[in-house]
Regions:
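Structured catalytic-domain cores with a bias toward divalent-metal coordination
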Residues: 1-203
């Protein structure tokens, strides 16, 4: 079965990098987010791997980059969708937030006509997230805070606890969802998500 995402068709056994274009700068230059898709020849679940929701959390970005560089994202069955940097503005400026001062992880699921951060959340939630059967989101300790490597999951979820044990981080932390976060949006639509935290931002 072909996967049609962001207007592009990807067949089983194919790989493709698609540009997720959601806004223009004042110079009319498009702002594009690379979306790396790998499909096995055998059908199976789709795993969405993201990082860089906060632009200064570069450890997560590098983890996803290494997953791609080492071909860990090539599945035996099913599909992987990798987005190393969701907040390109923040990443380029080494800033947690968007240029409008908003935190992308506090505006989900976003609105079509809202702030820049809200529009990114909206189009990501509408155009990419529905394809995911499982989500894995990589973060780094914010505001120069060091976080021990850990997986954060929603409390009282046997499925997430099982997935966390498979990931096998040194710590599994049961944390309630924060309003308007990516994790909360996944929870509301019934898509399991593991959130990884590790290290310190800007390092």
């Amino acid at each position: 079965t072909d996967l049609v995402i962001l207007g592009e068709k990807i067949a089983l056994g194919q790989s493709k990098t698609i540009n997720f274009s959601f806004a223009k700068l004042y110079t009319s230059s498009k702002v594009e987010i690379p979306v790396i898709i790998q499909r096995a020849k055998t059908p199976g679940p789709t795993v969405l791997i993201t990082a860089g929701i906060h632009g200064d959390e570069i450890n997560g970005v590098e983890i996803v980059r290494q997953i791609i560089a080492r071909k860990i994202n090539i599945p035996i069955s099913g599909t992987t969708i990798c987005i190393p940097i969701l907040n390109t503005f923040g990443f380029l400026n080494a800033d947690r937030t968007f240029p409008d001062g908003r935190d992308l992880n506090r505006v989900f699921p976003g609105t079509k006509t809202g702030s820049l951060a809200s529009r990114v959340a909206y189009y990501f939630t509408k155009e990419i997230l529905p394809f995911a059967d499982y989500c894995l989101d990589f973060h780094t300790g914010g505001a120069q805070r060091f976080n021990a490597p850990q997986i954060r999951i929603t409390p009282k979820s046997p499925e997430l606890l099982k997935l966390a044990s498979i990931f096998n981080a040194p710590f599994t932390v049961h944390v309630s969802n924060i309003s308007k976060s990516y994790r909360t949006t996944c929870h509301k639509i019934g898509t399991p998500i593991l959130l990884f935290e590790g290290g310190k931002s800007q390092s």
